Amino acid sequence: MEEFQVYLELARSRQHDFLYPLIFREYIYALAYDHGLNSSILVENLGYDNKSSLLIVKRLITRMYQQNHLIISANDSNKKRFWGYNKNLYSQIISEGFAVSVEIPFSLQLISSLEEAKIIKSYNLRSIHSIFPFFEDKFPYLNYVSDVRIPYPIHLEILVQILRYWVKDASSFHLLRLFIYEYYNWNSLITPKKWISTFSKSNPRFFLFLYNFYVCEYESIFLFLRNKSSYLRLTSSGVFFERIYFYAKIEHLVEVFDKDFPSTLWFFKDPFIHYVRYQGKSILASKNTPFFMNKWKYYLIHLWQCNFYVWSQPGKIHINQLSEHSFYFLGYFSNVRLNPSVVRSQMLENSFIIENVMKKLDTIIPIIPLIRSLAKVKFCNGLGHPISKPVWADSSDFDIIDRFLRICRNLSHYYNGSSKKKSLYRIKYILRLSCIKTLARKHKSTVRVFLKRLGSELLEELFTEEEEILSLIFPRASSTLHRLYRGRIWYLDIFYFHQ
């Protein structure tokens, strides 16, 4: 963020607040290159080290300075369009660099809004595990939950019109429009799956920018109406500056609701509604009745249809009772479990029996999908029986053990928040035995002979539980650590979850 701010201030002083000239700056492509090496959140890395270099960028900038070269590359020997979809290296590099330049003002706006609201930066809050303590604190007191998948894609023209309110530089806006419409036909949606998949892989940063912008626009209106319209003049709604036709959109939504419901905004004022999202999936939970949740359901459908012209099937948004149904979010099945208890109270000669029900959030590891994932990458078969990993048999013993250890520790690190650790122990057992079988295969031996020769203590020490390691470091507190470790542990250093 600080690098972005320095670069943007430099460009502003020289280019009068225009973003378009930034695509002629070499450091923009350096930032895109660095992002490509370090990011693998939604899309796989495409080998940026093979596709980007300072020489290629210099050559690209020189060609962009040529007149009319940004429209059609007439000098290309293969006669391909300069912006041809996934056919030209230059178009991909420009799209990545342009995505960086467009992200800069949004990053600065976010920083300024946080400073105005006096929100302290906390890297712990960036961890996706920080969501689960929130679940533990709030969800036992709620009754209903709804799984909502944000519909995507949005029509191109709607996306362009939304972006027009934010991108004030006309040249940048026209270049952005050129990118979008050259990648897709005018009358197509952004959604044939083969197109969206190819586009997300060939231009990951540009794709993420468009998707995140759409989600941000949807959530800004959703949360604004959730907090009722009187909040518009407060500091918390600073993200709505310079919005054109925003009031008109709200009036249109109000008219839609006025036709369907007697009261328009009263159901936005419920203090017990909670909204959580990660990537394209969100959770909506409330303490109110199913009738209230059903209103929210159709409110979201109207919002998508009226404001973004995206169709969402009402039957795909399910409203379930938390005590009877589990919802899947961030790799866990979660539900609210009822723990009934009976307390006998004695007062003088009279005794009373008091029945009490405690609610507790359960987080369960999805063992069957995890075993399927392990079977897909050849750690076990479809039934969960460990098998060797032949692809790794050519590596050294140290590399083989290190790979298995990293996978085992990462899974243990992520799923230590489970209420029931039995499933986690099963996954560890599969990885441990698969490691032994891979080593035995490499040395052309059986598992029994290999362990007898090497000694089973070695792998036992390598796969030692974190609980045992802590007890060795703090022997006096071993009993306390044992009770703590058997409970749920949420780590605040996990920043993304790769599906």
Curated annotation (Swiss-Prot):
GO BP terms in the entry: mRNA processing; RNA splicing; tRNA processing
GO cellular component terms, semicolon-separated: chloroplast
Keywords: Chloroplast, mRNA processing, Plastid, RNA-binding, tRNA processing
Pfam families membership: Intron_maturas2, MatK_N
Main localization, broad class: plastid
A single GO molecular function term of this UniProt record: RNA binding
Keyword field contains Flavoprotein: no
Compartments where found: Plastid, Chloroplast
Family in the record: Belongs to the intron maturase 2 family. MatK subfamily.
Entry function: Usually encoded in the trnK tRNA gene intron. Probably assists in splicing its own and other chloroplast group II introns.
Protein name: Maturase K
